[in-house]
Amino acid sequence: MILRLYAMVISYCCAICAAPFQSRTTDLDYGPDKTSEASDRQSVPNNFSHVLQNGFFPDLSSTYSSMAGKDWNLYSPRVTLSSEEPSGPPLLFLSEETVVHPEPANKTSRLKRASGSDSVSLSRRGELSVCDSVNVWVTDKRTAVDDRGKIVTVMSEIQTLTGPLKQYFFETKCNPSGSTTRGCRGVDKKQWISECKAKQSYVRALTIDANKLVGWRWIRIDTACVCTLLSRTGRT
């Protein structure tokens, strides 16, 4: 019994000695490295400021590997980085049109929908929008207003390993040559004073602030044409 007790004590001591020592720093190995993230955020603007003074832009394909990829327009549908001007609307806008206006599979269903079904799309019923709008790719945007109300410079060209990329913005504006330049369509002019105005939304774009720091910021661009009303009687 005494020999067996000695053997158990020796095995327990050996097990304790063989266990690895864990310091308090091992807890920092789990999850993202906050220290490295903070250093990256500080080093990127410094690099950008340095290269801006030299007159050229850095290679962003290594810093932002997904920025120049094919899926970039899925992250920011109204902002596109491309070597040439896009020939059509963003993919998300095309997919939305496909969902809203699906083509019937056969002639029978086409005839049923044309005979007055509720599933007929608005455009096929002859309905018109209150304000005429037009979608355009803006290729020469120089400045914009960010979410803090500051005027920032929009980067027009970015150098990458595959060549220069330009920023294009898909904006929706009020049609200057449309029939709603003097008021909204379908509004009683005797009761209301109407006007079609551009509505702006925020998108992310690569910009330069007043301190010459480059970064992704929220800026305002035209994204819709809406109708504003003013009562002729109460002026409200």
Swiss-Prot record:
GO terms for biological process: cell surface receptor protein tyrosine kinase signaling pathway; modulation of chemical synaptic transmission; negative regulation of neuron apoptotic process; nerve development; nerve growth factor signaling pathway; neuron projection morphogenesis; oogenesis. Disulfide bonds join 131-196, 174-225, 184-227. InterPro entries: Cystine-knot_cytokine, Nerve_growth_factor-like, Nerve_growth_factor-rel, Nerve_growth_factor_CS, Neurotrophin-4. Pfam families: NGF. Residues 1-18 form the signal peptide. Coiled coil: none annotated. SMART domains: NGF. Keywords: Cleavage on pair of basic residues, Developmental protein, Differentiation, Disulfide bond, Glycoprotein, Growth factor, Oogenesis, Signal. Glycans are attached at residues 47, 106. NT-4 could play a role in oogenesis and/or early embryogenesis. NT-4 interacts with the low affinity NGF receptor and elicits neurite outgrowth from explanted dorsal root ganglia with no and lower activity in sympathetic and nodose ganglia, respectively. Belongs to the NGF-beta family. This is Neurotrophin-4. It comes from Xenopus laevis. The gene is ntf4.
